């Protein structure tokens, strides 16, 4: 069972990595396509410089997030049902939550604290003097802690879908 859980988490984390790389492609605005990972002081500077609009992250970010969630929930449901053997809400919810928090902490520790805090690729021209904000690990860790509750909300539909699949197939 542990091997299956690890494999499910690995598959889902790889999907998430693909989504991150997709969101920083040049057609999506490069690193500006991930403004939600930047500390507020950097976002404020970018707004002041006119690099990003005053209105927020923009419709592209919201669309990409919605697509990722709409792909992730059925994918996790299939992983839990067909691969993990879940047939009830609770077991599917727990497996889905485990996949979500594995993906979350991978993103926080590897992409946030590792790549974002140390790669010059993420430094936006005009914000170079904000090095302390770029190296703020705590900002990413706080986001991970807060994100754990949001992941529980995202795991619930997986539990419902798996429960529905079990009823339909049984």
Ranges and model annotations:
Residues 1-98, 102-170:
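Juxtamembrane/disordered regions of integral membrane proteins
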